[in-house]
């Protein structure tokens, strides 16, 4: 099974294609400087990096370029985007709503969007990346892997800050424990 993994940052998009059965990385790369003079880096397994400038006014175009590169007849690792069996998206902030990786349905995406105030630099571009993937790969399952999910088992005495409790109740101010995917996977 080939899984495309995407991590949308505020002005970048990191990606890998992984064979989930062997856990081998088949290709990886990075779209940098999204919104200005974009640069795409692509590296098939066991080969040198390929780097070129490309117009990427937004994350949508970055996703399109990644899919185009992965299916490039000269050095792409896929004959067709239909070979992508699933897409995993790094989701920075799911608030207290998600305690595990989650299939990205319309309802889930609305809930993630409601957490945008908690991660204003990360959640919006991630949601744009998810929307682009859903449009370009409409029958491919999309899964969100939440940074905040790993730490959902912290007891309240570990996640409540020494601030007025109303900040937690009103603004969801608490310790979330980020980079959970680095701990779990």
Model-based region annotation:
Residues 12-56:
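Short glycine-rich, Thr/Ser-proximal phosphate-binding strand/loop in the N-terminal lobe
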Residues 123, 127, 134-185:
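ATP-dependent carbohydrate kinase catalytic cores
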Residues 37-85, 129:
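Conserved active-site "lid/cap" helical segment
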Residues 70, 74-122, 143, 150-158:
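Short beta-strand-loop/turn "lid" adjacent to the catalytic site in phosphate-handling enzymes
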């Amino acid at each position: 099974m080939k899984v495309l993994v995407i991590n949308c940052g505020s002005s970048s998009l990191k990606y890998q294609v992984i064979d989930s059965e062997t856990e081998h990385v088949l290709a990886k790369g990075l779209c940098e400087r999204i919104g200005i003079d974009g640069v795409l880096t692509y590296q098939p397994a066991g080969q040198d990096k390929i780097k070129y400038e490309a117009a990427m006014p937004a994350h949508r175009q970055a996703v399109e370029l990644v899919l185009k590169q992965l299916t490039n007849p000269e050095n792409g690792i896929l004959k067709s985007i239909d070979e992508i069996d699933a897409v995993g998206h790094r989701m920075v902030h799911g608030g207290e709503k998600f305690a595990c990786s989650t299939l990205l349905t319309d309802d889930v995406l609305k809930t993630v969007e409601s957490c945008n105030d908690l991660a204003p630099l990360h959640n919006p571009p991630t949601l744009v990346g998810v929307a682009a993937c859903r449009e370009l790969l409409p029958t491919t399952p999309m899964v969100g892997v939440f940074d905040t999910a790993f730490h959902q088992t912290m007891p309240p005495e570990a996640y409540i800050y020494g601030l007025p409790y109303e900040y937690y109740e009103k603004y969801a101010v608490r310790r979330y424990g980020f980079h959970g995917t680095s701990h779990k996977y």
